[in-house]
Amino acid sequence: MDDIQNDQEPSAPETGIDLEKTGVPAVPSNQDGDQQNSKLPLPFALNFSLLMASRPMSTLAKAVSLLYALLKKRPKCPYTLYVVVLALIDSAAVLFIQWGMYKEPTYADPDAIDANTKLFDSIPGQLTKFVSQMWMEQKYIWLLNFLVLGMVHLALVFVLNRFWVATAIFSIVMSVFAVANSIKVSLRNEPVIPSDLGFFSSGNGGEITSFIPKNRQSLVNGTITMLIWLTIICLALQLIDGRRCVIPCHWWRPFRNVKTIIGNCIRIIAAVLSVTLLWSFTWNLGINDSWSYNWAKSLGDNPKPWSTVADATGNGPTMNFLRLAHTKTMDKPEDYSEETMAALAKRYKKSAKITNESRANKLTDNTVIMILSESFSDPTRVPGITFTEDPMPNIRALKNTTTAGLMLSPSISGGTANIEHQALTGLSLALFDNSMQSPYQELVPHQKSPYTFNQIWNSVYGKNGSVAFHPFYKHMYLRDSDYKKFGFSKLYTLDSKPEITHQDHLGTSPYVSDAASYQNVLDALGNSDHAQFIQLVTMQNHTPYDDYYPDNQFREADVSELSDDEKWDIDSYAKGVDITDQATEDFLNQLNSTDKPITVIFYGDHLPGVYNTAAADENNAIPLHETDYFIWSNQASVSAGTKLDSQTSSYTSSNYFMALAAEHLDAKVSPYLAMLTQAQTQIPAISRLVSSNASWGDGSTVYLDAEGNHVTSKNLSKEAKQMLHDYRLVQYDMTKGKNYLSNYGFFDVQ
């Protein structure tokens, strides 16, 4: 024991370091006086102490201390610099995003084009015009986009409270948006829209690089390089900037003094207000007469709901994107619930069962061809228009022998896709909120599985049960993406792959003729060994109405007392109607020669905007919204020669076409079709009428009775009001609600 007590503390190695000063504990000795593990390395604490005491580390510590002292004394960037940088970044973002909408023009004979025209038509020229229209045309579209992006930028700044970090994030997001927009426009002639974000949410984000074409890879690489450097610069500036926070605040001790409390409150208020402003602007932009809609309009915003690419080009991709981010679909019915919808489904299941007991046929035993004939209508029904020659003698005669009548259209000279959407879905535009301008662009992209009537054939014949043709461009009204959701196996257009086969034109018309359009349908019939649903949207009679066709006999046949200019357009249109009339007669004759049962639903979508004199008279509002339709079956069909009574068919609207076709075919129906059949009986025609000569906008709901008389909502019968309420419930459930009806077989043909 004495030996142990007399043991000395282990001495330090020969390094000149006093172990006691280092704070390293002594190494204990064993009973023999030897150090334990004497041959093992020195303890970690000792090694660390030695390292820290070395000259290099001492120098590094001094450098860090000096750097910290410098950082504490770093200057604060003035707020004016923030404002200047924000303005420059946002201006560049507007131009970069808009740049993606433009393409360099091509000329058939470049030598015939002067240098100034080439300059103005170039991408820099188009960008210059986009900005200069502020003082040239008093259209402040560039300023509007600048202010909107400013809202986004400021919201990021106030939420993060770090100007340079927020600027880096803003620049990255806007650059990605600009590049993605440019690539999508080059590939599909469509800008980026909110529904595209679903591509990432569905787990396909990793595949996005596969869509980048080779000629755009340099743009992507250059943008990535630019963003890397910009991010480095912004992060460096964040370190250098002595104003670490835009708004001084402290979360560690938020109530330590009055100054801290005020700073924290300002920070919270600024973040909440900036986000609320951006949210409110986006939420209301697509709603007519809202504050953001009116403010944007005052700066020159001119919504183009018929075309996202036209809207993005004219108003900016940012405005187009935010406009489609939210649209009010319709108000929720007060009694909407799962219990209500279950009871409704049960009621119409019973109705369908009763109807089907007296019907012998199936819809899917027939090929149904739904033809939207662009702008087709009878010119002689327009007040003040008189011809000595009938422009549509064949269809007029046909209407006397088959189910036919007049269709109430929502608009004049436009809104084609709205009428088309009604015909394919059975939904009525009149039941949507007035802010719903174009369901194809504002509703369908947000729906997961929208219901359309072609799906009846798909349920029997699979994915080849339905096909569509449109001899124009697929980006119009987002038909390409919407038709995929509808379940069409293919939409053949001028720019589809493969293209629509027959593209013949007549005279100098820029549009594919109806005869060529019909030939595409005939080819589809010949290539299928089963019944199918075929959708055709024609283009021949689309505006403008120039002197396309030679030997226009209606120049002489027009005896209307109108101005020469107005008569010129009307006569040009009448010639197109005459050509459609003959092409349709030939088409139906060819259908009669086949042994396949075929039924055609033919309708004009709206009247052309050429009747200025008639449109000036408010009494002509309804006649100028009535087009011609017929439902016809060929000789191979058991419904050949069928003509529904006038009480049922004289007046209707496109949402009822499939219900009328089922009745014409004596075919069994689903509960949904049973509901539409009853609705058509109670309310023969319903439409949100735009009474002016315009394609889009607000309109009042118009109801027609079986004789075509206008009926106000107050004067609807009790049964009609209940029917209308059921219709609203169904439409809400299918579009904005929980889709309860799909769980009860509401769309299944029994």
Predicted regions and their residues:
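Alpha-helix initiation and N-capping motif
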Residues: 197-200, 315-318, 338, 392, ...
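Transmembrane and membrane-interface helices of multi-pass
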Residues: 3, 16-17, 28, 39-307
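Membrane-interface segments at or immediately adjacent to transmembrane helices
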Residues: 282-370
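Short hydrophobic "helix-edge" motifs at membrane interfaces and signal-peptide entry regions
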Residues: 135, 363-365, 594-596
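Solvent-exposed soluble domains appended to multi-pass membrane proteins
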Residues: 354-359, 372-373, 378-750
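Serine-centered coil/turn micro-motif
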Residues: 54, 58, 290, 316, ...
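Acidic/Ser-Thr/Pro-Gly-rich, low-complexity N-terminal segments
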Residues: 1-35
